[in-house]
Amino acid sequence: GNKEWTTANIPKVVGGIDAASTAVAQALYEQIVSTVVPVSSPRVAEMVKLLENTFRAVNIGLVNELALMSHRLDVDVWEVIDAANTKPFGFMPFYPGPGLGGHCIPIDPFYLSWKARQNGFESRFIELAGHINAGMPQFVVERVVSALSQNRKPLRDAKVHLFGIAYKPGVGDVRESPA
């Protein structure tokens, strides 16, 4: 799904149960990938992956909330994102959509949140992003119904074509796709 970043050039984080197992994992992955990042334990390696995926989910939730807000304020959220992206530092663009999809982004943040609850910590930010993202398919449907109504087209007579139902461009994987 990404021509620039492949298995070979995406850094691989490894953490073994001790220094020897970390070294073995590192030696194995160095045969396949260009950069291996050793960490102190499997727990740290797992938390790295959870952070990466939760970061995406939370930022998608933020931009989805901005899309909802911009719709109410009659502001083009895409123009806002494009203009904000001209700042050369401190901004990373995320784009609104029908929610989260794929085999890890929709799952990992909620595993992390569940694990936090198991240890007496409430991760409100992650849960809120999940709530916002979970509501996006309904928002998309409401927008379609509204567009049909504005064009005096009854929903029951409408033919709506869905394009791009995979969770990201360039892939055929529809796991957890909100579309």
PLM regions with names:
Residues G1-A179:
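Structural/interface elements that position substrates and couple domains in central-metabolism enzymes
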